[in-house]
Every structure is written in structure tokens, then in C-alpha cells.
């Protein structure tokens, strides 16, 4: 969910008539609260453990997604992305869990894999979020380009679509995160 804005940036800029500075502000807001949030999440981890902290963070992720997806103004987009920056603090939880779930001689490798696959998430979301947005065009909120737009994502074949439902895709990613947060709470333990 933290990476769900960039795949739709061009569409959102076009729909809202944003200036380049406004588009950049929205991107900056996505990380603006991440650093202080990582400190707060770290303190919550120490007090409540990774299972509860991560579950609540995933459930919380639905809130900024729904705010951003239902935005009607630049200011509402900014608020949604600022609140989304807190979700970026989830990285801290994975570091802690990796350290607790693996023996000391394997923690470095495990955290390297965790960090590497975490970065892969940004590239993967560029593909999946657009596909999700196209698949949800039958729902209200689709943005009509007026004529087909071509999308080329990574090494996959280009495709064209006249409609892209970025709002439902972003809202849907938040809802999926919240559902996964509930699943996580009932199926994961803090330590092995």
C-alpha cells in the first residue's frame, strides 16, 4: 500500500489538474512522516511486540488509502499521503521479527533477503496496481482518458485501456491490507 500512488501519478495529475510542484508534494508526503513514525513504531514494538503492532499498522493502512481514494481536492490528497507515510514505518517491524526468528549467524542473510524483497515490492506494485485499476473499471470512480492510453510496465507487453479506476485500486489495496492485518494477528506469533 505504501507504493500505491506512483503507478497512478500521471492519471491523478491529469484528473486533478495538478502542477508539477503539487505532484511532487504528494510524493514527498508519502515519506514525510515515515522517519518519526519508525521511532514510534519501534517504541510500540518494544512494548507490545511485532504481532500486535504489525496487525494494527496493516489495519490502519486502510484509513489513508480510503482518504486518498475518495479525495476531491489537492489538500485531501496531501492528507491521505501524509497519513500513508506512517505505514512506511512497517519496515521496522520486519527487522525486529527477522532478528527474533533467525539464529544470530543467519540474521544478516535473512535481513538482506527481507530488505531486498521489500524493495521489490515497489516494482511489483507498479505492475499489479495498474492491472488492479484496469480490472476494477466496472466499478464507480473510473477515470476516462477519452481515448485509449498505452501502459508499458517493466518487461511485460504494453496494453491499452481507455479507463483506469485508480480510486478503487488504492481503496482496495487498503482493504486487502486491513484484512491481512486481521489474518496476521490470528496466525502469527511474535517468536517461533
Q: What are these model-predicted stretches?
A:
Residues 1-20, 125:
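Extracytoplasmic
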Residues 3, 31-39, 89, 123:
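Residue-level signature of mid-helix packing/kink "hotspots" within the transmembrane helices
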Residues 36-75:
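Conserved MFS/SLC helix-loop-helix module at the cytosolic interface between two early adjacent transmembrane helices
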Residues 58, 62-65, 80-81, 174-181:
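A generic transmembrane-helix signature of 12-TM secondary carrier transporters
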Residues 80-117:
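Cytoplasmic helix-loop-helix junction between adjacent transmembrane helices
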Residues 109-140:
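Glycine-rich segments within core transmembrane alpha-helices of 12-TM secondary carriers
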Residues 134-137, 174-192:
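C-terminal membrane-cytosol helix-exit motif in multi-pass small-molecule transporters
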Amino acid at each position: 500500500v505504501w507504493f500505491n500512488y506512483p503507478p497512478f501519478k500521471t492519471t491523478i495529475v491529469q484528473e486533478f489538474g495538478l502542477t508539477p510542484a503539487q505532484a511532487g508534494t504528494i510524493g514527498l508526503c508519502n515519506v514525510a512522516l515515515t522517519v518519526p513514525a519508525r521511532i514510534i513504531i519501534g517504541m510500540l514494538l518494544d512494548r507490545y511486540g511485532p504481532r500486535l503492532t504489525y496487525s494494527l499498522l496493516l489495519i490502519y493502512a486502510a484509513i489513508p488509502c480510503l482518504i486518498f481514494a475518495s479525495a476531491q481536492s489537492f489538500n485531501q490528497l496531501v492528507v491521505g499521503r501524509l497519513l500513508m507515510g506512517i505505514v512506511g514505518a512497517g519496515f521496522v517491524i520486519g527487522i525486529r521479527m527477522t532478528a527474533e526468528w533467525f539464529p544470530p549467524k543467519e540474521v544478516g542473510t535473512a535481513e538482506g533477503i527481507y530488505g531486498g524483497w521489500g524493495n521489490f515490492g515497489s516494482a511489483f506494485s507498479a505492475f499489479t496496481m495498474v492491472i488492479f485499476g484496469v480490472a476494477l473499471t466496472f466499478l464507480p470512480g473510473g477515470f476516462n482518458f477519452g481515448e485509449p492510453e498505452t501502459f508499458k510496465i517493466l518487461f511485460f507487453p504494453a496494453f491499452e485501456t481507455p479507463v483506469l479506476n485508480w480510486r478503487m485500486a488504492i481503496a482496495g489495496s487498503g482493504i486487502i491490507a486491513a484484512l491481512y492485518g486481521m489474518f496476521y494477528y490470528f496466525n502469527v506469533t511474535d517468536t517461533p
